[in-house]
From Swiss-Prot:
It comes from Saccharomyces cerevisiae (strain ATCC 204508 / S288c) (Baker's yeast). Disruption phenotype: Has a respiratory growth defect. Shows partial growth on nonfermentable carbon source. Although initially predicted to be a dubious gene because of an almost complete overlap with MRPL51, it shows transcript and protein level expression. Essential for the functional mitochondria and respiratory growth. One of its GO terms (cellular component) is mitochondrion. It is found in: Mitochondrion. This is Mitochondrial protein YPR099C.
């Protein structure tokens, strides 16, 4: 799936939820921008792996207005499908070009954890 293709959260969710083990998929930033700009309700940004000083930069970068910041993983996240995490705790402002890795944890609950990789 290319970054220019329209984002279909249900299709992506259905594909990844078939796995019963940890799965990683790489997305480009434009792909993620497109998904977030469409206001997909299945997206959630969490601070679980975001350094405190990096969180404001990340939220501004994606222009996400409605987000949750749960303090822990399940059960708080058991109803979430997609979660964005910033995996680089030393990112400068603005964040340098990175790839996004989606990790599906379907043994606990059907949601996708998306992390930024440097």
């Amino acid at each position: 799936m290319s970054p220019s293709e329209s984002f279909n959260s249900f299709s992506l969710f259905s594909t990844l939820s078939m796995f019963k083990f940890l799965t990683q998929i790489t997305f480009s930033r434009p792909f993620v921008y497109s998904a977030l700009n469409k206001g997909c309700p299945d997206f959630l940004i969490t601070s679980n792996c975001i350094h405190g000083n990096s969180w404001p930069h990340l939220s501004n970068l994606f222009e996400v207005k409605n987000f949750l910041m749960p303090s822990e993983d399940p059960p708080q996240l058991q109803n979430c499908k997609v979660i964005f995490l910033h995996g680089n705790t030393n990112a400068p402002t603005p964040l340098r070009p990175m790839e996004f890795r989606a990790i599906a944890f379907t043994t606990i609950s059907p949601y996708i954890r998306v992390c930024v990789s440097t």
